[in-house]
Amino acid sequence: MVRTDDQPYVPTPIDRLFSHSYVRTQLAFQLDDVSGCATLLRRGMERLIRTSPFLSRELTIHMNDDQTESITTKPISPQELDRMLKIKHHEKPLRQALIEASNDRDCLDDKFMPTSFHRLDVSQPCPVMVVQANIHPDGVLLAVATNHMVMDATGQGIAVQCLADCCRLEQGDVVSLPTCSADQDRGRELLLHELPARIVNREFSEYRPCRDLYSQSAALADLAHKAATTIRVAHFTIAAEHVHALKTRCNEMLSQVFESNGHVFGADDAPWISSSDVVIALIWRSINCARYQALTTTQQPPEKQAKKDSGEVVHVGIPVNVRSRVSPVLPGSYMGNGAILVLVPQPLRTFSGTDWMSTICRVGLAVRTRLAAITSDEIRSLLHYILNAPDPIAFSFDVADYFVSNWRQMGFYEADFGSKMGKPQRIRNPDGVVGGTVFIMPKRSQPENAPWELQVSLTDEMLRLLDQDDVWATYVRPDTYWP
């Protein structure tokens, strides 16, 4: 890792897949007494910078004379802490202030976020991590933004937990911090030099050719600008007992469903799906049926029937954390980008008919089968392809019809800031860039049967149609905390 001013930064193969945007998260703490929170967070951030120098850097993209790009990095000095931590005091209670700003995304950004998701001048230095502590009379809204060029959502969750531990140390608690600097160096070394050695003659349709970071960032900014007026982020919950019941029923049905089509399974290779697979299948099925309402009706006009029978394929894109899937594995506290995108295709006709349980079985198994195929060899092949493709490739929203990001195992709710602030009670990603973007939010450890939390980005019309879907209405409930 670069440790001196204005040094070149060599992106890892996975870094190259992401544009110059920010992963942004809001953590809400409802508190009786907010005095001293700003001081605690400032001291915690100062300690975090000493512990994890990687987080206290800025990145700058340069366009060279030969039209190639280069990236440089330099540290933010302790005297410039305000570039990493912004403190803003608000007169109104937390939820009231959010509700009043919720109809204007630019206003929400200006008041509550440390940096914009998309309004970035990529030629200017941009911090790896920047935090804004919004101090309200009844709590703190901690807004965290991390630069996706070098850091993914899992890395952000690790950084938030490290910040929380640093705040606890400032309060005298005994906390063991990970060896963050060594882990960042080791993770980059693996991704740059040790892992990209698997050579296969194939392309990866999950990504698109990309001219440069400038054009890529401009395209993303255009999408985000359009979404600000057309896409709404809605929040939902699914009771844990509903998820368990659906998973149990699916696993009971799977062999029967596939044996009816001539598949025979032995005792050791019987198909199975996880709770997350079931939730993804339920989401995919319900949004698809809202988008193509004719799928579940028996009386269909000819053009709708033709569409259903045409063999059209729909895709869901699922980011997959590869830290533990590669060999050798990446360090557990590696904060850099460690996620790749996989596509799960399904014929549109899979979602037709009224036997929705069989649909969830089939779709859930398709998700499980694709995720199980993400081996170390496939990941290494992708890394090699990124480094040797004739043109740069990058993530693009046009590769799938829907995207489901599973944050279930990210430890945001376990970030304990100590006796002064405790753990966050609510978490959200405030950005819905395109319609059909879904987040399965982090799991709560308490209570044990806490509901699953979902965040869905759709147009108002699609949300209305989704609400009319009988299966969705049976299992999913609105979460009204976030406006």
UniProtKB/Swiss-Prot annotation:
Belongs to the fumigaclavine B O-acetyltransferase family. One of its GO terms (molecular function) is acyltransferase activity. Keywords: Acyltransferase, Transferase. This is O-acetyltransferase pboB. InterPro entries: CAT-like_dom_sf, Sec_Metabolite_Acyltrans. O-acetyltransferase; part of the gene cluster that mediates the biosynthesis of protubonine B, a hydroxylated and diacetylated cyclo-L-Trp-L-Leu derivative. The first step of the protubonine B synthesis is performed by the nonribosomal peptide synthetase pboA that catalyzes the formation of cyclo-L-Trp-L-Leu by condensing L-Leu with L-Trp. Its EC number is 2.3.1.-. Pfam families: Transferase. Disruption phenotype: Blocks the production of protubonine B and leads to the accumulation of protubonine C and protubonine D. Pathway: Secondary metabolite biosynthesis. It is an enzyme of class 2 (transferase).
